[in-house]
Amino acid sequence: MPFSDELARGLAVVAYDRRWPGDFAVLARRVQDVLGPTAVRVCHVGSTSVPGLAAKDCIDIQVEVRALDEELIVGCFGTIGFRLRPEPWNRVEPTPGGPCPKLVFAPPEGDRASNIHVVEAASEAARRKLLFRDFLRAHDTARDSWSDFKQRLAAMAADIYQYGQAKAGPTEILMLAAESWARQAQWSLPWSADGGGSGHSMVPACSPACRRPGCGGGLGGHHSTDP
């Protein structure tokens, strides 16, 4: 569930905002700077990462790490005020291949609305979020239908929890279509071991971990570039 300060924002699915990629870039830089070499990739995922798709005004970021070291990662995010979401569904991502551990962080109170999803690099959970995004980017009809569904659902749902529960089933149905497209189009991630750069790899909005001197990788190595 959202923190109390997040509940005050209410539930609204709004038209696509061209500022969202820039908002992602600012947040991604903060994440890169605080995690340093712990982060392998930082990617824009979720509805705000799909041009033309209506979404809640909340930036979703996926961070891939080599190992999900909870103490280290929670400590790093704590230095910039990000809060670990404690709910069970924010600790494990169910996938067809089995559950994948994850950590999800909320921003400091009063900060720009966001969710930071931390998963193990190249895990099935990481792959599925990027596939879902790329499928909607490649299919205008699916994107527009999903956009309309979410706006209608948001207008009927009592709160963010009911909205999320009602959206879960249709999301999995859409995911089946995405998996079918991935097989037909030979979609693969640009960095996947078996993709080799061939097939329908769509370059994602992802950044490698910060490698500049001063970027932190431990609890005391925070290097801030906050605007």
Label for each model-derived stretch:
Residues 12-18, 62-66, 131-136:
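Short histidine-centered catalytic/ligand-binding loop motif
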Residues 82-122:
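Conserved catalytic core of two-metal-ion nucleotidyltransferases
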Residues 1-8, 104, 120, 144-148:
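Short, compositionally biased low-complexity segments
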Residues 72-81:
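Short amphipathic alpha-helices in soluble, non-transmembrane regions
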Residues 1-43:
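Helical scaffold of the NTase/Pol beta-like nucleotidyltransferase catalytic core
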Residues 118-200, 206:
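Catalytic cores of NTP-dependent nucleotidyl/adenyl transfer enzymes across multiple folds
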Residues 200-223:
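Cysteine-cluster motifs in flexible loop/terminal segments that predominantly coordinate metals
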Residues 30-72:
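Active-site nucleotide-donor binding segment shared across nucleotidyl transfer reactions
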